[in-house]
Amino acid sequence: MWKVLIMKLFSLTCCSTADMPVDFFRQNDIPFSCFHFIMDGKEYPDDLGQSMPFDVFYKKIADGAEPSTSQVNAEDYEKMWEPLLESGSDVMHITLSSGISGTINSARVARDNLLSRYPERKIEIIDSLGASSGYGLLVTTACTLCDEGKTLEEARSWIESN
């Protein structure tokens, strides 16, 4: 039996707050931007339990630690997207809900900076209007659309109308 290979027509990216396992992102070639959190006076990337395992994180909270968070900055987005643009790929980025974070604004600043250098490319930024598992479900659906060979415009249209 022949296996049909479908070329992806765009690159999908998201934020670590989509709360999917790191293996999901690796297996599906989805770069993610890391939010950061501060705990006990030290800053950590929210890299899905790689820098601080989840059991350690939750034990610290149970022991009284009070973490705070910071959003992704424009420079981090530029570092994530520029190699994709250089390779000739357009980008769809799905952000954490604008209702709970301003990270979409950082993404827009990065997009505008990069498109001035890569005017032939496209960067579509989609507000997930969700968080955690709801956000993750949207990323999973976008991944499926990308894998099916949908164009950036087709995928965006489907996501925004559903």
Regions picked out by a protein language model, each given a short descriptive name:
Residues 111-132, 151-153:
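Short, acidic/small-residue loops that bind anionic groups at enzyme active sites
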Residues 144-162:
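Internal, active-site/partner-interface "lid" segment
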Residues 96-117, 137-139:
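Short Gly/Thr/Asp-enriched flexible loops that form oxyanion-binding sites at enzyme active sites
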Residues 119-120, 134-147:
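Acidic/polar active-site rim loop that often engages polyanionic ligands
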Residues 90-98, 124-127, 141:
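Short glycine-rich or small-residue beta-strand-to-loop segments that form or flank ligand, phosphate
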Residues 1-6:
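Short, Lys/Arg-enriched N-terminal segments with co-localized hydrophobic residues
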Residues 11-76:
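N-terminal glycine-rich anion-binding loop in soluble enzyme alpha/beta folds
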Residues 74-84, 109-111:
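Short, charged beta->alpha transition segments
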